[in-house]
């Protein structure tokens, strides 16, 4: 049973392959997520907690995640919302409640090179003093 924790930084998850590009992280495997070159198969879960906002070209990464997941596998995403998105100078993109529909079969998404066709299982906004977070669960 393969489970991936993308952009783990110092947040290791036991039982997952913890992935990061930084040698200062607590990663088990080192990948630059900008290159979307991971070759795992039959992945059951992918956790992407506060990493997608750091990715300049997210389309190849989302396509790669979809490709790696087994049928019924899930991707758990958490991204900052509202003012919190631009508080960190390393954030390069923002997300809204509509952002992930392009990876869920939204019309014309293939024009942008999107091959992922996730099913959106849930989406939840959780307010906090930093502006809040958007939690999304996608399934292959």
Segments and roles (model prediction):
Residues 1-83:
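Conserved SAM-binding loop
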Residues 56-66, 70, 74-140:
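S-adenosyl-L-methionine-dependent methyltransferase catalytic module, highlighting the catalytic core
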């Amino acid at each position: 049973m393969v489970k991936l924790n993308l952009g783990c930084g110092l947040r290791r998850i036991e039982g997952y392959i913890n992935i990061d590009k930084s040698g200062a992280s607590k990663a088990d495997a080192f990948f630059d997520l900008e290159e979307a070159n991971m070759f795992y198969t039959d992945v059951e879960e992918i956790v992407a907690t506060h990493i997608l906002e750091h990715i300049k070209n997210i389309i190849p990464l989302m396509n790669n995640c979809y490709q790696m997941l087994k049928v019924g596998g899930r991707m758990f995403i958490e991204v900052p919302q509202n003012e919190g998105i631009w508080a960190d100078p390393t954030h390069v993109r923002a997300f809204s409640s509509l952002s992930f529909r392009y990876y869920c079969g939204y019309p014309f998404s293939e024009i942008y090179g999107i091959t992922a066709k996730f099913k959106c299982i849930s989406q939840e906004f959780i307010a906090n003093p930093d502006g809040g977070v958007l939690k999304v669960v996608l399934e292959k």
